[in-house]
Amino acid sequence: EMCIRDSLGIKYDPSHSFVHGGDKGAYLKEGMEWGDKFVYCHVKGVIQYGDSHEPSEWKNRELMVRHPELKDELMGDFAADRRYYDNPPAGIDSINWRAFFAVLYQHDYDGYLAIEPHSMTWQGEKGEKGVKYTIKYIRDLML
């Protein structure tokens, strides 16, 4: 008899292991542990300068929801300067996509791959070129 837990899947984004304060290689560990549950993966590059500031934003999230007028003050430097990380195209970022795909193949992943361009730097024509670069780069990793 199948239980609900067996029928649930995970939408996974390896870049979140970086910007949410995780160990830089956490996405590989998470993939090894949970990859058999992945049903949808985001393909979004990330580069990060120093430690993540994002966990402090989440601490204040409930307060910001109740008092949106205080959002800028509560977020402090995080709101004013998000330059401690960016989301360049996959393949010119910090994620080891070859190793991540090896983990996906280990689990016989056959789910979706979604390119997710959120960069503040890669906008307009540069953003379009970045998406094309990501498509080419990821295609080369597909068997």
Which role does the model predict for each range below?
Residues 1, 5-94:
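Acidic/histidine-rich catalytic cores of soluble enzymes
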Residues 13, 41, 104, 113, ...:
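Conserved, mostly hydrophobic/aromatic
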Residues 30, 103, 137-141:
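A generic secondary-structure signal
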Residues 37-39, 86, 97, 108-115:
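A short pocket-lining beta-strand/turn micro-motif at the edge of beta-sheets
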Residues 92-106:
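A short, acidic, amphipathic alpha-helical segment used as a generic capping/interface helix at domain edges
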Residues 114-130:
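A short, acidic, flexible beta-alpha connecting loop/helix-capping segment that sits on the rim
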Residues 125-143:
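C-terminal helical cap(s) of enzyme catalytic domains, especially alpha/beta-barrels
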